[in-house]
Amino acid sequence: MFDALVIGSGPAGLAIAAELAQRGLKVQGLSPVDPFHPWENTYGIWGPELDSLGLEHLFGHRWSNCVSYFGEAPVQHQYNYGLFDRAQLQQHWLRQCEQGGLQWQLGKAAAIAHDSHHSCVTTAAGQELQARLVVDTTGHQAAFIQRPHSDAIAYQAAYGIIGQFSQPPIEPHQFVLMDYRSDHLSPEERQLPPTFLYAMDLGNDVYFVEETSLAACPAIPYDRLKQRLYQRLATRGVTVQVIQHEEYCLFPMNLPLPDLTQSVVGFGGAASMVHPASGYMVGALLRRAPDLANAIAAGLNASSSLTTAELATQAWRGLWPTEKIRKHYIYQFGLEKLMRFSEAQLNHHFQTFFGLPKEQWYGFLTNTLSLPELIQAMLRLFAQAPNDVRWGLMEQQGRELQLFWQAIAAR
């Protein structure tokens, strides 16, 4: 019997599997796809976030010229931003798994059963795998993770192109975090939920451009995002000449937190770890995998008398302590506000937000502020914001009051 069975081999699965294996635990991996199969999606992260972990060698690209547009003048961010070398990131975790003796089993988890001191996962092929604890990392629709139902799920959606263009779609050597300019849209189109350009120069005349909806319920269709991207490029006199890769991105931003008393532990999207106000997650995987692994190792090492349910509860609390739960609800509260803002309010909000001390907006986006620091940053934003943003923040609609009280009442 294994100490832990990790289901899934995406970034979340490899991150927690590597941390568990490095702690000397007997870990089995179960994945429906080859864990060594190359990842396709791009993953970005702020430079200091990776530097603080001593993992800057995992960057494939890094930009010091980082800007956003919430009007005609660029906002200089004064922080560098990077794109992971996907192969390097994947190999980093796979090497740690191998060093810890982890073995991968190809197969799809089909059923799970629990007794007092272990869980048994049955694969679609009928194989049974037993472990003291199961960690499900199979994403936002993880079959073994229970969470409250919600009819108000907001999705971040994006359509992007890596390729070559008739002329640079952005300045050479530049990274654009958000370009909310909408001069390429008709007045009627501007009444629809706003989208922004996320773009970067990858070198050798290759650029990545992506039209992104920060969050919308229901999700903005890919066809509309693609149309808007081509409209944006055409307005700037840019045509697509070579498409090397098309990227489609869709994930929920505000999934309810899982049931923290269940006997299966989640990680990554399965554990609602997407930053509700920004969509970032890979930095959180790197920072929080050790927290979960430590909690699991402590539960296994402290006493063999811990039941499966008790071990899972200890693990969940290691991943979601009270302060993180409270911050999560505050971020969800903020997301509700952003989705209600008009285009003008949204631009005014972001102009104010990125006018905060850079440690505050950076800490907000990376979820590295303490709870008191987060509240201080939000109060400062309210004090400095123009009246239309203040009014939007004060006006309470929909789920906003519920989320506010959940943040206060979290235990």
UniProtKB/Swiss-Prot annotation:
Protein's job: Catalyzes the double cyclization reaction which converts lycopene to beta-carotene. It also converts neurosporene to the monocyclic beta-zeacarotene but does not cyclize zeta-carotene.
UniProt similarity note: Belongs to the lycopene cyclase family.
UniProt GO molecular function: lycopene beta cyclase activity; oxidoreductase activity, acting on paired donors, with incorporation or reduction of molecular oxygen
Enzymatic reactions: a carotenoid psi-end group = a carotenoid beta-end derivative; all-trans-lycopene = gamma-carotene; gamma-carotene = all-trans-beta-carotene; all-trans-neurosporene = beta-zeacarotene
Keyword check for Repeat: no
First-level EC class: isomerase
Keyword Isomerase (UniProt): yes
Binding annotation for NAD(+): 4-32
Enzyme Commission (EC) number: 5.5.1.19
Domain of life of the source: Bacteria
Parts of the chain that traverse the membrane: none
Cofactor: FAD
Name of the protein in question: Lycopene beta cyclase
GO biological process annotation, one example: carotenoid biosynthetic process
A Pfam entry, by short name: Lycopene_cycl
Keywords: Carotenoid biosynthesis, FAD, Flavoprotein, Isomerase, NAD, NADP
Documented activity regulation: Inhibited by the bleaching herbicide 2-(4-methylphenoxy)triethylamine hydrochloride (MPTA).
Pathway assignment: Carotenoid biosynthesis; beta-carotene biosynthesis; Carotenoid biosynthesis; beta-zeacarotene biosynthesis
